[in-house]
Amino acid sequence: MRIVFMGTPGFAEVILRALIENQNNNIEVVGLFTQMDKPFGRKKELKAPETKTYILENHSNIPIFQPQSLKEPEVQILKGLKPDFIVVVAYGKILPKEVLKIAPCINVHASLLPKYRGASPVHEMILNDDTIYGVSAMLMDLELDSGDILGSASFLREGYLNLETLSLKLAHMGATLLLSTLKNFHSITPKPQDHASATFCKKITKADGLVGFKDAKSLFLKSLAFKTWPEIFLENNLKLLGVELVENEKSHREGEILRIDERGVLVGCLKGSVRIARLQAVGKKPLKAKDYLNGRRLKAGDILA
């Protein structure tokens, strides 16, 4: 079974690794298509996609392609690889009709479709306080995440998970689902999605990390969803790190410092309160909340803004 894999971030790398390292010798990954290396960090040094790094470090015999687009030259390259399947996981590009014709294109998407079609499904699960998390395998078509479902897997939330932890758990679940889907592909009856029930999610931007002290639970959920990037910050760009939801019922003055101790600062919201372990001013290192507030001469009763 010859497979071309299309995927870019760490979520895709977990699934690519499972494909290559599984005990079924019938699977052969014959090529990786991934996004181009991109500038990263303050120095804007080029950073390779996680999938590319994994292949270079572990399976350098597998060819890597990083095209800007999927046009006729790339289509011919794909055809030349003679795939039985094209597996797509967080690739970052919509496949044109010419690619979809080459072989069945199976997409592993980090949501229970038709819920959360688009670029940030894991963020949306967290932000919407979902109690069931899951992944879907679908047969791709020309529209965004709208293809027929080949299978899905899910689990019931037992506690709050941040983006990194939930993504990793879903990636491993997606890998198991994909291997099963490939093995049983010819006996699976694809099921059309209920398009009327579809919801969509957008690409996350820096501005999404801006928060205020209105709703404690919303602030807490954003801290989980945006932990890796863009993190959460106030209008003065003060970052809030290590946020804990204390309660979500009482009403306080917006941003009122209720208590300061070694665990952090307890801050009131219009609804609820949160404890913040560390604070980070622009261009500075993170500090214990107590140390930061002492340096600013802020005390209980003052407003954190």
Curated annotation (Swiss-Prot):
<comment type="similarity">
    <text>Belongs to the Fmt family.</text>
</comment>
<dbReference type="InterPro" id="IPR041711">
    <property type="entry name" value="Met-tRNA-FMT_N"/>
</dbReference>
<dbReference type="Pfam" id="PF02911">
    <property type="entry name" value="Formyl_trans_C"/>
</dbReference>
<dbReference type="GO" id="GO:0004479">
    <property type="term" value="F:methionyl-tRNA formyltransferase activity"/>
</dbReference>
<dbReference type="InterPro" id="IPR005793">
    <property type="entry name" value="Formyl_trans_C"/>
</dbReference>
<keyword id="KW-0648">Protein biosynthesis</keyword>
<dbReference type="InterPro" id="IPR005794">
    <property type="entry name" value="Fmt"/>
</dbReference>
<dbReference type="InterPro" id="IPR036477">
    <property type="entry name" value="Formyl_transf_N_sf"/>
</dbReference>
<comment type="function">
    <text>Attaches a formyl group to the free amino group of methionyl-tRNA(fMet). The formyl group appears to play a dual role in the initiator identity of N-formylmethionyl-tRNA by promoting its recognition by IF2 and preventing the misappropriation of this tRNA by the elongation apparatus.</text>
</comment>
<feature type="binding site">
    <location>
        <begin position="111"/>
        <end position="114"/>
    </location>
    <ligand>
        <name>(6S)-5,6,7,8-tetrahydrofolate</name>
    </ligand>
</feature>
<protein>
    <recommendedName>
        <fullName>Methionyl-tRNA formyltransferase</fullName>
        <ecNumber>2.1.2.9</ecNumber>
    </recommendedName>
</protein>
<dbReference type="GO" id="GO:0005829">
    <property type="term" value="C:cytosol"/>
</dbReference>
<dbReference type="InterPro" id="IPR002376">
    <property type="entry name" value="Formyl_transf_N"/>
</dbReference>
<keyword id="KW-0808">Transferase</keyword>
<dbReference type="InterPro" id="IPR011034">
    <property type="entry name" value="Formyl_transferase-like_C_sf"/>
</dbReference>
<dbReference type="InterPro" id="IPR044135">
    <property type="entry name" value="Met-tRNA-FMT_C"/>
</dbReference>
<dbReference type="Pfam" id="PF00551">
    <property type="entry name" value="Formyl_trans_N"/>
</dbReference>
